[in-house]
Amino acid sequence: MALKDMTAEQLKAFRDECRKQYDDFKSQGLKLDMSRGKPCKEQLDMSMPMLDVLNSSSSLIDADGVDVRNYGFLTGITEAKKLFADLLGVDPSMIIVGGNSSLTLMYDSVARAMQFGVYGSTKPWGKCDKVKFLCPVPGYDRHFGITETFGIEMINVPMTPQGPDMDMVEELVNNDPAVKGIWCVPMYSNPDGYTYSDETVKRFAALKPAAEDFRIFWDNAYCVHHLKDDHDSLLNIFDEAKKCGNEDMIFEFASTSKITFPGAGVAVIAASENNVKHISKLLGMQNISYDKVNQLRHVRYFGNADGLRKYMEKHKAILAPKFDTVIRILTEQMGDLDILTWNEPKGGYFISVNTLDGCAKEVARLCKEGGVVLTGAGATFPYKKDPNDKNIRLSPSFPTLERSEEHTSELQSLPNLVCRLLREKK
């Protein structure tokens, strides 16, 4: 029965039962972490053989005859460029292979734009009277942290199952020259798990920005992170942008952080020829080369993009049961109460849960006191301010399958808060 249909007496009885369950959870002294999309130990163990690919007897000369131990090749070795180019569906000349973190590449891209501008800028963003960024919400907290760090004004754009509200995006981008960029996680978005529709990608590619130096930050973090056999597919934005003469408008990012070792993987930028030249010129003042040994290690381990895609099946075998378990428990224990809604993603690392308005912070607090750490309520919005206080991001990847069940079962005890709120309304 939906809670809103219960009498005051039924609500009281249900609340008391929830409190009892919650107290039982607290007494177990659980210490469970669902706060970040971290690979679990089993996933990390999968990549251990990669550490044996190179040793002191290995040839560290790449296919072009480059000794990867030495300086040089700022934008990465050819073999790594080809692997990522095949993965993202672009030409290898469009790839800059960076260090271990795509987040660093994104931060540096904003920093360069603020200090020097981007290709096509008449002046640095930092010398403009105002700089604005569009932020699809709910979204990735670390994206918002970057733009907040640089004092960039962030504007919420609601997400839909097809992607950001493109009517709003077009209105703002095409008419406000202060709008310099937008954050996008186009495939299995964080946290909703939505993949942008073909129409959405085409509308992005066809934007007519009022700012000549507007950029789409296309964070394709989950491009191969499928959970289902009938997985989503994403239209290639560069192919569409070229049709509109807009290929300079896009910065695409990807990494192996959730493929091999987070913090010890390989990250890339994909961009137009003009952007690659502009970025490389500035990057050359900052760096001589990234870790080419690690680039070679990854290439030899996977062989090619198809080898990497096949490897992702192993991740799916570990992650899919955890996601299925969380969805099953939410459905069994909360499905009839009409107080939570959630998505069932086909890939990515998160499940987005929405409470009734005004309840997310309290739910997160109760979870924390019960030993379950969630991403902070509000974190999926700029400035950590969820206007409706309703969105919670669940990250099932890190706990074991058994603990994933424990994590989610605790949510059953949390409607006591909602019971109380509904009873007060009555």
Where would I find each of the regions flagged by the language model?
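PLP-dependent enzyme catalytic core of the Aspartate aminotransferase-like
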Residues: A2-L3, A8-F14, S58-L60, D64, ...
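Conserved C-terminal alpha-helix-loop-beta "cap" of PLP-dependent enzymes
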Residues: R15-K26, N275-V276, S280-K281, F350-R393
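Conserved core of the PLP fold type I
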Residues: V66-E212, C223-G245, A360
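Conserved core segment of the aminotransferase class I/II
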Residues: G98, D239-A320
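Conserved glycine-rich beta-strand-loop-beta hairpin in the small C-terminal domain of fold type I
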Residues: E313-I327, I339-N354
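Single conserved hydrophobic/aromatic residue that forms the stacking wall/gate
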Residues: E406-K426
